[in-house]
């Protein structure tokens, strides 16, 4: 899968991307929202082993700026995740466009519902998800522990196609 819109590209992650993915995944500033304030402590070899369908990278003007993923969790239901890892690319609407590209592709390819969760403290992400039409399903208070054993809370979201608000025209697919 390869999707393009303006200067943005979403494509399948490749072995050549593993070094950058490893750097991001080991960066506590990038991974803190996911419960890993010290990073994952993973190796490039482990990242390469984990590359597969649904593991994608985000490029802006041919520069790697983040990653996204999806996985089938039930019949017609995909769970997604996204990280804009390069701080100079955050707060510019890139995530909203990338999510519009990915979600539109998932709906065009047979999915009827998209689900995701985010840390309760990640209000920036919550605003983006809600602007795309996601509906808050549940708040899970003190439901998991981060790397330091601190209790964390999360918010579960879901989106059906009729509620989807895209921020792009249809992207080019290859």
Short names for language-model regions:
Residues 21-29, 47:
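Hydrophobic alpha-helical core bundles mediating ligand binding, dimerization, or RNAP-core interactions
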Residues 34-89, 99, 105, 160-163, ...:
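Acetyl-CoA-dependent GNAT
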Residues 86-92, 120-121:
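Active-site acidic-Proline motif in GNAT/NAT acetyltransferases
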Residues 91-108, 127-131:
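Conserved acetyl-CoA-binding loop-helix of GNAT-fold acetyltransferases
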Residues 115-118, 135-153:
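Conserved catalytic-core motifs of GNAT/GCN5-like acyltransferases
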